[in-house]
Structures are given as C-alpha cells and as structure tokens.
UniProtKB/Swiss-Prot annotation:
This is Bifunctional purine biosynthesis protein PurH. One of its GO terms (cellular component) is cytosol. Keywords: Hydrolase, Multifunctional enzyme, Purine biosynthesis, Transferase. Pathway: Purine metabolism; IMP biosynthesis via de novo pathway; 5-formamido-1-(5-phospho-D-ribosyl)imidazole-4-carboxamide from 5-amino-1-(5-phospho-D-ribosyl)imidazole-4-carboxamide (10-formyl THF route): step 1/1; Purine metabolism; IMP biosynthesis via de novo pathway; IMP from 5-formamido-1-(5-phospho-D-ribosyl)imidazole-4-carboxamide: step 1/1. NCBIfam families: PRK00881.1, purH. The lineage of its organism: Bacteria, Bacillati, Bacillota, Bacilli, Bacillales.
Length: 511
C-alpha cells in the first residue's frame, strides 16, 4: 500500500523541499489551507484534506482535521487485525507521516498590542490533537514538528526506505515536549490574565540555549535554558561579542553582577566572585566607577566578572586589560574599547540592556522534591518610611555611603555586612553563620579605610556586638532593618560612640 503523509505547518521553513523529497520517495501527500496553497504554488501535487474527510474545512479553519478518517488513519495499530478490519470496513487509509507545527501562540502574545481575542484565536486545537495521536502510535507513524528534523527523516527514507524505530521514538518524545511547552504558554497566559498568583499547579517552559561543558564542578553535567520570551536585561538574552563560550559558573556570576549593577542609575561598576560582590564603585563616568570598584578589592577582582551600566570606553578598556577577568558585561563597547579587549582571546564580552527587574518577576529555586517560587527582591530604600533611633543623624556624606552599602548588601549571601566609603565598597562580609562574624570579615578587609565609613546589614542585630565591633573600627554610620527585641541595646552602644543609625524596616536575606 502506498504510504501517505499529512502536512500542515505554520512555520513553513524548508517544507517545500521536504515534501518534494517525500514525493520522490513515492509518498502521497495530504495537506491543508495555506500549506496546500504553498506546495501547489511550487508545482507539487498534493491532496486536499477535504478529499480524505469528505467534509469541507469549516469555521475559518477551526475544524478541518478533527475527523475519524484522519485520526483513525493515525491511531490504527497496523498489526492489529481488528483495527485493520475496521479501517477496511469504514474506508479509512493509514497515515504514515505527520508534518505539523502549531499556530504561533507564543509569537502572538509577544506582540505589545495583542488582544485577548487574538490570543485565543491562535490556540491550536487540531494540530496538537493530530501530533499527539501520531506520537502515541509512533511505532507506525513518523511525526515531525521541527524543521531541523526534515533532513534526518529524508536521509533514512533514502537509505532504508523507512524511518528507524529509534528515530520515531525520539520524534515522538519531541512531540510531547512540544505540546507540553505549548500548553504551558497558554496556561500561563490565561493564568496571568486572570490575575492568579499561586495556581494549584505550576507549568513552566524553557527553551534550550546551549549545552555547557560541565556544571558547577567538572563531574556535573549541565545545560543552559532560556525563558521563552526575551528578557532583554538578562544573561540568557545577552549578545556575546567575543571570547570563549560561557560556563555554568560564568552564567551564575554574570547574573549576580548584572542584578547588582541594575541598582544604580549613576555610572557604576560591579566586580563579582562566586556570586558575591567583591567591589562596587560609582562615579561621574564609567572610568572613575571602575577605578573605585578595582580599588575596593584589588586582590579578589582577579579572575572576576565585571558589570557596568554605561558604555565601556577606550580608557576604561585599557584599565580592564591590565588584569585577568573572565567576563565584562556592559550596554555597549566603543569601537576602540573592543580593539583593546579583543586582544585577549578568552575574555568574554557581553552586551545587555540594563533594566531593573520588577516585582512581577518570579524567582524559582529548586529543592529536593519541590520548587520554591517567590517575587524577586526588587524593593528599593524608601526614605519616607525609615526611622533614626539614635541621637545623631547621618551627615550628607554618610547618607551617600549608607545608600550605596544598602543597595549592595541585599545581593550578598546572608549573613551579610557591607562597608562603604567615598562612592565605593571597602569591605564585604558574606555567608557567615553569625552576623558579627561577617562584620569582622568586612572590617578586616577594609583595614584603615573603615575609619569614617558606613555599614549596612541585611538583617537586624540580635545583640549589640556588631555595633561594638563597628565602633572599634571607627565606623560612624549604620543602616539595618531594626526589629530585634534587643534593638535598645544596639541603640545605646551607637549613642555611646556617636554612631548614627538608620532603621529601614525591611530585611534583605539572601540564601
């Protein structure tokens, strides 16, 4: 019996050449709507779907393939005598190939002016039903939803006269991934339209961007996936201008650096190691900002990741060129800066839009057996809600330093302490199991610079010991959430040493 293929695609990439190849193999082709017109326009002989169903396409194409003659031909088990007898009795013929991709729902809802009606109209019904039927019966039916697989199928047909069973299984698995992702997009769109924040089931879909050489360590396998809709201010959608491909750790560190630099509107540069900032500087221009970020910790910056929120110019590039760095991220690089930096063949240069995340952005964290979902921590300092419990208020310069330290401390692994002075961080204490331990690390790193600096803490002081350490180091201003049952003890110590302290009422834990 002559083999038959059903072709109905929204993405018409390569379909004319593929169908031509099928016809050359003696395969009869059935087609629908716009696909049929395209194939006939290119001189290919195809059969209209209505000739198979005996029923016209109706309701603006909503109903055309939802017919027993189609699904019987797809689902019939060819070595089941009952199925074969029923097909013969009803005049059905088997369909051996299905080439279908779905209505462009993703592209439709990505349009800024899309209406709800447009979105609904672009939910495919017949397509998913066909490819699921074909994939279920993949022992007998080859189903292709991705143009990248056309060449593989044609090559096997030419070589063997049929598609290998292993290939059919792979294609079937791709179908169910394809429909699952498609349904997830629809589910998420409708859920968002209804304003539901915590649905009873969560469906997420990501698209493979690249395989990685390995994960956090060489013995771990890893892959990088991107969100289906472009998040322009992200590493996933950054443009790489130069250098080796990104590693797993590169991606994590670059994401951390980008998150911090988004906090600043003035020219700023952030240096990151192991997802913690080692130096942050701001200035009147990007060169000055980088100089301060470098001076913040000239040891730890070696082998680090740099993020800037302004174009990298030649002067800044020449300074960056002096040390070993893994990645530089910026909105752009001047032509002269690129010439300087591209002389280092392994240095990765990325361009990305610098836009602060919104609270609508969700952070997903996997745990064993589950997934945590929360809003991104995008809350900025609100000066209208702060309180100053100490006798002395911060000076203008202290306020400037406090604000910088507060912007940075929320991005440091808890327990977190950050010291800032003169438009730069001078000490970062991260990830200690007690707060005073983090304070001691930050103070030790700052050394003599701690005198007259400002301290930020991501959470309240359970005891006054951190304030005591700050006083010993000559720190003159502190910003912290407040809210401890022993706040009064910390306030008394601050007043004793003339330290100005600000309560924000907001905690910024980061785990």
């Amino acid at each position: 019996m002559k083999k038959r293929a059903l072709v109905s695609v929204s993405d018409k990439t390569g379909v004319v050449e593929f169908v031509k190849g099928l016809l050359e193999q003696g395969i009869e082709v059935i087609s629908t709507g716009g696909t049929k017109k395209l194939l006939e326009k290119n001189g290919l002989q195809v059969i209209g779907i209505s000739e198979v169903t005996g029923f016209p396409e109706i309701m603006d194409g909503r109903v055309k393939t939802l017919h027993p003659n189609i699904h019987g031909g797809l689902l019939a088990v060819r070595d089941n005598e009952t199925h074969v007898a029923q097909m013969n009795e009803l005049g059905m013929e088997p369909i051996d190939f299905v080439i279908v991709n779905l209505y462009p729902f993703k592209e439709t809802i990505a349009k800024p002016d899309v209406t709800f009606a447009d979105a609904i109209e672009n939910i495919d019904i017949g397509g998913p039903t066909m490819i699921r039927s074909a994939a279920k019966n993949h022992k007998f039916v080859s189903v292709i939803v991705d143009p990248v697989d056309y060449d593989v199928v044609l090559a096997e047909l030419k070589e063997n006269g049929e598609v290998k069973e292993e290939t059919k299984r792979k294609l079937a698995a791709k179908v169910f991934r394809h429909t699952a992702a498609y349904d997830a997009l629809i589910s998420n769109y409708l859920t968002e339209q209804m304003g539901e924040e915590s649905p009873e089931t969560l469906t997420v879909t990501f698209e493979k961007k690249q395989d990685l050489r390995y994960g956090e360590n060489p013995h771990q396998k890893a892959t990088f996936y991107k969100a289906p809709f472009a998040v322009t201010s992200s590493v996933a959608y950054a443009e790489q201008l130069h250098g080796k491909e990104l590693s797993y750790n590169n991606i994590n560190d670059a994401d951390a650096a980008l998150s911090i630099v988004k906090e600043f509107t003035e020219p700023a540069v952030v240096a990151v190691k192991h997802m913690n900032p080692c130096g942050v500087g701001v200035g009147t221009d990007i060169h000055e900002a980088y100089t301060r970020a470098y001076e913040a910790d000239p040891v730890s910056i070696f082998g680090g990741i740099i993020a800037a929120n302004r174009e990298i110019d030649k002067a800044t590039a020449e300074k960056l060129h002096e040390i070993f760095l893994e990645i530089i991220i910026a909105p752009s690089f001047s032509k002269e800066a690129l010439e300087v930096l591209q002389s280092k063949k392994n240095l990765r240069l990325l361009t990305v839009n610098i836009e602060k995340a919104t609270s609508a952005s969700k952070k997903l964290t996997s745990v064993q057996g589950g997934l945590l979902v929360q809003e991104e921590d995008t809350l900025s300092l609100d000066e209208s809600t702060i309180s100053i419990p100490t006798k002395r208020e911060p000076s203008e310069q202290e306020w400037k330093d406090l604000k910088l330290a507060w912007k940075v401390v929320k991005h440091v692994k808890s327990n977190a302490i950050v010291l800032a002075k003169d438009d730069m961080t001078i000490g970062v204490g991260a990830g200690q199991m007690n707060r005073v331990g983090s304070a001691k690390i930050a103070i030790t790193q700052a050394g003599e610079k701690a005198q007259g600096s400002a301290l930020a803490s991501d959470a309240f002081f359970p005891m006054p010991d951190t304030v005591e350490e700050a006083a010993k180091a000559g720190i003159t201003a502190i910003i912290q959430p407040g809210g401890s049952i022993r706040d009064e003890d910390s306030i008394k110590v601050a007043d004793t040493y003339g330290i100005a302290m600000v309560f924000t009422g907001v905690r910024h834990f980061k785990h």
